[in-house]
């Protein structure tokens, strides 16, 4: 993020992965539930270096940052569960609450 702390980012992603597994398990047990994951912006302009290694091969990763601020990079939106198909495509952030509201009707 703003500190350009690649080690911290990796640790946060591990924590996020653990949390996401718990949430997906919950959705699987409660099929009326929708899980939506997104961000309001990207920060840091993170780039991962490429050295031509095979997929699955463990190699050191070289992360670089273009800024300590926000970027204009499009952020993903992931949806899982009841109504997830409504999140196919590209959305402006302000459109997402309307999609969720429509699903709640």
Where are these predicted regions, by residue range?
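A post-motif C-terminal structural segment
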Residues: 1-105
């Amino acid at each position: 993020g703003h500190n350009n702390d690649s080690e911290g980012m990796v640790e946060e992603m591990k924590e996020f992965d653990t949390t996401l597994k718990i949430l997906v398990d919950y959705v699987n047990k409660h099929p009326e539930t929708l899980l939506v994951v997104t961000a309001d912006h990207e920060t840091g302009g993170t780039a991962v270096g490429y050295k031509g290694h095979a997929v699955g091969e463990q190699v050191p990763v070289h992360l670089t940052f273009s800024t300590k601020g926000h970027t204009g990079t499009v952020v993903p939106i992931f949806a899982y569960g009841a109504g997830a198909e409504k999140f196919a495509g590209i959305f402006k952030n302000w459109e997402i609450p309307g999609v969720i509201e429509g699903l709640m009707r």
